[in-house]
């Protein structure tokens, strides 16, 4: 359905943008793009770990986020269109969930590497940026008619 696609695009745009901001924040501190070399950041940056967890759970379409509403609309529409799409969509959701959790666990958990001992804490602007990504997701989750009203 058009409303499901629109809802999912807006939710995906906010969640993906939050992921990219978090990845850039990690890169600015570690000067490294390899997830295995950036492990254990939860010990040094607990608030950043919270933002990673929030982005991961939002990406998993955790209820009651707007991501879940969009995915439910798209899944029900595609299932009524063709039964084979439900298998492909389910597989896609499983792979996305596994990768999101793998990325969170790899970056946040584990033992610290030796080059990350002297790391700067997150700036207020970075925390505000993450909040500015999360606020629309929460507001749209509380009142999805903001999106659905335009598409129905």
Curated annotation (Swiss-Prot):
Q: Which Pfam families match?
A: Proton_antipo_M
Cellular component terms per the entry's GO annotation:
mitochondrial membrane
Localization: Mitochondrion membrane
Q: Which UniProt keywords apply?
A: Electron transport, Membrane, Mitochondrion, NAD, Respiratory chain, Translocase, Transmembrane, Transmembrane helix, Transport, Ubiquinone
Catalysis performed (reactions) = a ubiquinone + NADH + 5 H(+)(in) = a ubiquinol + NAD(+) + 4 H(+)(out)
InterPro entries (alphabetical): NADH_UbQ_OxRdtase, ND/Mrp_TM
Mitochondrion is among the record's keywords: yes
A Gene Ontology biological process in which this protein takes part is:
ATP synthesis coupled electron transport
EC annotation from Swiss-Prot or TrEMBL:
7.1.1.2
The terms under GO molecular function for this entry are: NADH dehydrogenase (ubiquinone) activity; ubiquinone binding
Q: How does it sit in the membrane?
A: Multi-pass membrane protein
The text of the family note is: Belongs to the complex I subunit 4 family.
Question: What exactly does this protein do?
Answer: Core subunit of the mitochondrial membrane respiratory chain NADH dehydrogenase (Complex I) that is believed to belong to the minimal assembly required for catalysis. Complex I functions in the transfer of electrons from NADH to the respiratory chain. The immediate electron acceptor for the enzyme is believed to be ubiquinone.
Under what name is this protein listed? NADH-ubiquinone oxidoreductase chain 4
Q: Please tell me the species this chain comes from.
A: Macaca fascicularis (Crab-eating macaque)
């Amino acid at each position: 359905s058009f409303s499901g696609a629109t809802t999912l695009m807006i939710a995906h745009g906010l969640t993906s943008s939050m992921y990219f901001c978090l990845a850039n924040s990690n890169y600015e501190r570690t000067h490294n793009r390899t997830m295995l070399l950036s492990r254990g950041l939860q010990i040094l940056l607990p608030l950043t770990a919270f933002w990673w967890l929030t982005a991961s759970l939002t990406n998993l379409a955790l209820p009651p986020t707007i991501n879940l509403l969009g995915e439910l609309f798209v899944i029900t529409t595609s299932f009524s269109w063709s039964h084979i799409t439900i298998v492909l969509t389910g597989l896609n959701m499983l792979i996305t969930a596994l990768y999101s959790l793998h990325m969170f666990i790899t970056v946040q958990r584990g033992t610290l590497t030796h080059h990350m001992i002297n790391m700067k804490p997150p700036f207020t602007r970075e925390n505000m940026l993450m909040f500015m990504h999360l606020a629309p997701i929460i507001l749209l989750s509380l009142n999805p008619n903001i999106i659905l009203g335009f598409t129905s």
